[in-house]
UniProtKB/Swiss-Prot annotation:
Biased composition (Basic and acidic residues): 18-43, 50-82, 90-113, 120-136, 206-227
Keyword Transcription regulation in record: yes
Transport as UniProt keyword: no
Pfam families reported in the protein's UniProt record: BEX
Gene for this chain: TCEAL2
Name used for this protein in its record: Transcription elongation factor A protein-like 2
Primary role: May be involved in transcriptional regulation.
Subcellular location, principal: nucleus
Subcellular location, record wording: Nucleus
InterPro entries: TF_A-like/BEX
Family the UniProt entry places it in: Belongs to the TFS-II family. TFA subfamily.
């Protein structure tokens, strides 16, 4: 009896061991298994989310770079096209403007510029020497100044302590200066008179070609112009 009891007792103990061995450690605790599975799922979700987050900023970085490159290329192309078009327009405009200006001014407006100076002034400017550019009033003043200077010098000689010989020399020099001045006047007058005769072939002359003659000028057949 004791042996059978022992055998019966041994059986349940062995069965309990077998049950314990066959059952996994988490089967006895379903709550623990659920918690572990949830943690695993959370970890997997976290890893996926982190991967997505890493990929998203990379994509965001790539997008602006690609967009910036595309914009820069588009702008450069537009600028190049605009410069080419602007250069062609600027080259085309001056020619048209020049033609319009040349065509817009009629011949009647161009001619007055050339005709603005009369022929008489051009001829006179070509024939006048350089000295005649000075006005006549200025020339008269210079002549008067020389005469006044000579008079003042004559009066001052008496006050100076010159000897008789020096006084004679000074008076001779002044006489020479006056003679030169008179001769220069006569030469200029004769030169002007000759110029008048050359300019006017029918200039009135006296009986012996003296100025201011009493007789009227004679006209021979040679003097009459051919009609």
């Amino acid at each position: 009896m004791e042996k059978l009891f022992n055998e019966n007792e041994g059986m349940p103990s062995n069965q309990g061991k077998i049950d314990n061995e066959e059952q996994p450690p988490h089967e006895g605790k379903p709550e623990v298994a659920c918690i572990l599975e949830d943690k695993k799922l959370e970890n997997e979700g976290n890893t996926e989310n982190t991967g997505k987050r890493v990929e998203e900023p990379l994509k965001d970085k790539e997008k602006p770079e690609s967009a910036g490159k595309a914009k820069g290329e588009g702008k450069s192309e537009r600028k190049g096209k605009s410069e080419m078009q602007g250069g062609s327009k600027t080259e085309g405009k001056p020619e048209r403007g020049g033609r319009a200006e040349g065509e817009g001014e009629p011949d009647s407006e161009r001619e007055p510029e050339s005709e603005g100076e009369p022929e008489s002034e051009t001829r006179a400017a070509g024939k006048r020497p350089a000295e005649d550019d000075i006005p006549r009033k200025a020339k008269r003043k210079t002549n008067k100044g020389l005469a006044q200077y000579l008079k003042q010098y004559k009066e001052a000689i008496h006050d100076m302590n010159f000897s008789n010989e020096d006084m004679i020399r000074e008076f001779d020099n002044m006489a020479r200066v006056e003679d030169k001045r008179r001769k220069s006047k006569q030469k200029l007058g004769a030169f002007l008179w000759m110029q008048r005769n050359l300019q006017d072939p029918f200039y009135p002359r006296g009986p012996r070609e003296f100025r201011g003659g009493c007789r009227a000028p004679r006209r021979d057949t040679e003097d009459i112009p051919y009609v």
